[in-house]
Amino acid sequence: MKYIVGARGSQLSVAQTNLVIAELKKAHPDTEYEIKTITTKGDTDSRPLFTIDQKGIFEKEIDRAVAQKEVDFAVHSLKDVPSELDDNLVLACIPKRETVNDVFISPDGSTLDSIKPGSVIGTSSLRRAVQVSRKRPDVTVKPIRGNIETRIKKASGENYDAIVLAKAGISRLGVDVKYTELSTDDFSPSPGQGAIAIVARADDSKTIEMLKKIEDPDSRLEIEAERALSDFVDSGCRFPVGAYAKSNGSEMTLTVTAFSVDGKQFLHVSKTGDKNNPKSLGQSAGEELREKGVNDLALNWREKVEEWNKT
């Protein structure tokens, strides 16, 4: 039996797809897998991500290939996958999640705390940008695009003194670079950060059963809580909300942070509940955020992004 696997052509996407295949081969040693790389809108549009008013820019073309039976299943970074898929597709598998932390990379070994005032920090994420500005208001934060290795090289160039990105990407690529891990207390991660999503056709029970061999139940439940929260407040690239769920026995704690554009205002919610009811936990955290005024922050962000788009 041979499966065709859809993925982006980026180094990270291919690397994490190969990691998935390696795990599948442990469970199904006689099965073959072939990667088919597919170009997405996110690969060809060089604008900062927060200015693109469209969800699924890194996965839509690949999932279309799944739906049209050009590939059997697709491997994505879960944070790039919209919570609502086409009716004929399903989030078939979430393998064990990597670390959710962000990291700070500077050529001279500086940390975020020690880097000199006036330094330029690059990031592709509004969420990271506002948290850098909140912790170090004396530095400049600029958008940065490109794959991970390109961004690391840019940190040594004329335009950037350091970058902030997800630790999971560095780990999966095996990049040899020194970094400082940032605490989730200071840098609340994106909902779904560090997780991989595998999408298949809803009616392809054989493929779904095969993929379930590498499913991690706790990772699935934690992701469901984070995405339920994200859906409730309608967060995304254009409105940064950090969310991190962690299981502990029969319980799960969901910690959420939302910021104003300038980082001076922030809302913080931490809720603990039954880990087997993650969507309820996410909605409960969302309701508390709403009571604390998250809708005002969201409007603040939408107005600012529209202003940026006009410049």
From Swiss-Prot:
UniProt modified residues of type S-(dipyrrolylmethanemethyl)cysteine: 237
The protein's required cofactors: dipyrromethane
Pathway: Porphyrin-containing compound metabolism; protoporphyrin-IX biosynthesis; coproporphyrinogen-III from 5-aminolevulinate: step 2/4
Top EC category: transferase
E.C. numbers: 2.5.1.61
An annotated GO cellular component: cytoplasm
Pfam family, one: Porphobil_deamC
Reaction equation(s) it catalyzes: 4 porphobilinogen + H2O = hydroxymethylbilane + 4 NH4(+)
Keyword vocabulary terms for this entry: Porphyrin biosynthesis, Transferase
Physiological role: Tetrapolymerization of the monopyrrole PBG into the hydroxymethylbilane pre-uroporphyrinogen in several discrete steps.
Remaining remarks: The porphobilinogen subunits are added to the dipyrromethane group.
Family: Belongs to the HMBS family.
Protein name per UniProt: Probable porphobilinogen deaminase
Organism: Nitrosopumilus maritimus (strain SCM1)
